[in-house]
Amino acid sequence: MKTYYIDTLKDVKKIAKMLDDINSPINKNNATLLHLCSIMSSDTEPIEYLLDIGANPYQVDIFGLNSFDYAKRNKNPIAGLLIYNILK
């Protein structure tokens, strides 16, 4: 099984393209990728990219959490970036 990392913009673009090729609803996939970046990404570029291509930070997962919740729970500093991008 191949391991994918989501810490750089290049990696996130590669995964987003792969999810696009699977034929799943694109906004849902990008929102899931945004959830993962909210937890693990130490760079803001992947998050800005996902927001620019239409990832919905309000999309909730099966646990009822959205990207804001994940960023706050994991004390990831990108929570402020997410909120800023939504409000601008």
Task: Name these PLM-found stretches.
Residues M1-Y5, P25-C37, V60-N66:
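Ankyrin-repeat boundary/"N-cap" motif
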Residues K2-K10, L36-D43, Y70-P77:
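Ankyrin repeat A-helix N-terminal signature
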Residues K14, I22-N23, N29, I53, ...:
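N-terminal cationic amphipathic segment used for targeting or macromolecule association
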Residues K14-I22, E48-N56, Y84-K88:
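Ankyrin repeat domain, specifically the short helix-to-loop turn at the C-terminus of the second helix
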Residues T44, Q59-V60:
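Substrate-binding/catalytic groove segments of enzymes
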Residues V60-K88:
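Leucine-rich solenoid repeat scaffolds
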